[in-house]
Amino acid sequence: GFGSLFKFLGKKLAKTVAKQAAKKQME
């Protein structure tokens, strides 16, 4: 349903944000 799609997008977004945060910390 719509809820599971939202959860999926949330997880993807969280992963992307975490990756970018890690990149910024490495610099």
Swiss-Prot record:
Q: Which residues cross the membrane?
A: none
Its cellular-component GO annotations read: extracellular region
Query: Molecular function (GO) terms listed?
Result: toxin activity
**Where does the UniProt annotation locate this protein?**
Secreted
For this UniProt record, give its keywords in alphabetical order, as a comma-separated list.
Secreted, Toxin
Alphabetical list of InterPro entries matching this protein = Cupiennin
Disulphide connectivity of cysteines: none
**Stated family:** Belongs to the cationic peptide 04 (cupiennin) family. 03 subfamily.
- Pfam families, per database record: Cu (PF17563)
- Kindly list the biological process annotations in GO that this record carries: defense response to bacterium
**Where does the entry say this protein is expressed, by tissue?**
Expressed by the venom gland.
- In its keyword annotation, does this UniProt entry include Secreted? yes
User: What is this protein's name?
Assistant: Cupiennin-3c
What species was this sequence derived from? Cupiennius salei (American wandering spider)
